[in-house]
Amino acid sequence: MAGVMSVKDFIVATKYKLIRKIGSGSFGDIYVSINVTNGEEVAIKLESNRARHPQLLYESKVYRILQGGVGIPHIRWYGTEREYNVLVMDLLGPSLEDLFNFCSRRFTMKTVLMLADQMIGRIEYVHVKNFIHRDIKPDNFLMGIGRHCNKLFLIDFGLAKKYRDSRTRTHIPYREDKNLTGTARYASINAHLGIEQSRRDDMESLGYVLMYFNRGTLPWQGLKAATKKQKYEKISEKKMTTSVEHLCKGFPAEFPMYLSYTRGLRFDESPDYMYLRQLFRILFRTLNHQYDYTFDWTMLKQKAQQSQSSGVPGTNTTTQGATVPSAGVPAGVAPGGTTPQ
């Protein structure tokens, strides 16, 4: 958008005024914007109408189908403004990747289990609506703001795909000639092998996200290769040769149980979401945790605020060396598409 016009001149649907850019991705740029009629802040995604692979219209249609679900951002408007496709939606808080960095790249078991419960619920809702997400990763889960600050939102449906007919419930056919869609770090083994993705792949990807939060890194991160294709092959090989037991070593048995279950699902099989939620809920109770929405970052932010109010300089922006994530991250700040790790 730089060089085309100034931000202050850009008004969407006669009432949404762009304030500042807060992100960008493969689709274009994201701005915090304000509804000039009531002062409400929203997020706006802009995509050039000359984009080689436009996805914003498709994403807006998926969002429309998902509207009303818990943890699904509300869509305010979609249309074109000047030379841009525009999606106006809820403004959300930081992503789980942002918060993971804020917490020095390690979450406590309590936080992981509280997140797992919400994450399984979000993915189940998308599946009930006949879609698979195909890019489950920490960047695509955002916390809400204000009264929704403890609610987890699932975003970025540019790679989502309808896996069954909404009327006949006929499942898409099994295929083995697919390119990897999504993010290699969290991709299922079958996705690496070129097998058409289905519900099982979203659930397996979530298992890798949870172990990433537990461990801090995954064994297939940081692999070096000359080309993207070779890197994907290395990640795939490492993933296939790392046993579930080794990946989850030192963590409760529920995590290898989760991954073994999801890897064992048939192509068109519906995951038993309640079984998976119960795995983690029972573990949560066994560990004597309280589901009080006190996440790791809640504690850190409270400490930062206390330090600030007590007059300690320099503590309002960082804690443990990480920038305090603030509200004002849009629904959809994470770039879509395939990424190398």
From Swiss-Prot:
Keywords (A to Z) from UniProt: ATP-binding, Kinase, Nucleotide-binding, Serine/threonine-protein kinase, Transferase
Binding, ATP: 22-30, 45
Keyword Nucleotide-binding: yes
Region described as Disordered: 306-341
Active site location: 135 (proton acceptor)
Biased composition annotated in UniProt, kind: Polar residues: 306-320
Ranges of Low complexity composition bias in the record: 321-341
PROSITE patterns assigned to the protein according to its UniProt record, in alphabetical order: PROTEIN_KINASE_ATP (PS00107), PROTEIN_KINASE_DOM (PS50011), PROTEIN_KINASE_ST (PS00108)
Entry's Gene Ontology molecular function annotations: ATP binding; protein serine kinase activity; protein serine/threonine kinase activity
EC numbers: 2.7.11.1
GO CC annotations on file: centrosome; cytoplasm; nucleus
SMART domains (UniProt xref): S_TKc
TM ranges: none
GO biological process: negative regulation of canonical Wnt signaling pathway; positive regulation of proteasomal ubiquitin-dependent protein catabolic process; signal transduction; Wnt signaling pathway; Wnt signaling pathway, regulating spindle positioning
InterPro entries, A to Z: CK1_Ser-Thr_kinase, Kinase-like_dom_sf, Prot_kinase_dom, Protein_kinase_ATP_BS, Ser/Thr_kinase_AS
Catalytic activity, reaction form: L-seryl-[protein] + ATP = O-phospho-L-seryl-[protein] + ADP + H(+); L-threonyl-[protein] + ATP = O-phospho-L-threonyl-[protein] + ADP + H(+)
All residue ranges annotated as the Protein kinase domain in the record: 16-284
Keyword Transcription: no
Stated family: Belongs to the protein kinase superfamily. CK1 Ser/Thr protein kinase family. Casein kinase I subfamily.
Protein name in UniProt: Casein kinase I isoform alpha
Organism: Caenorhabditis elegans
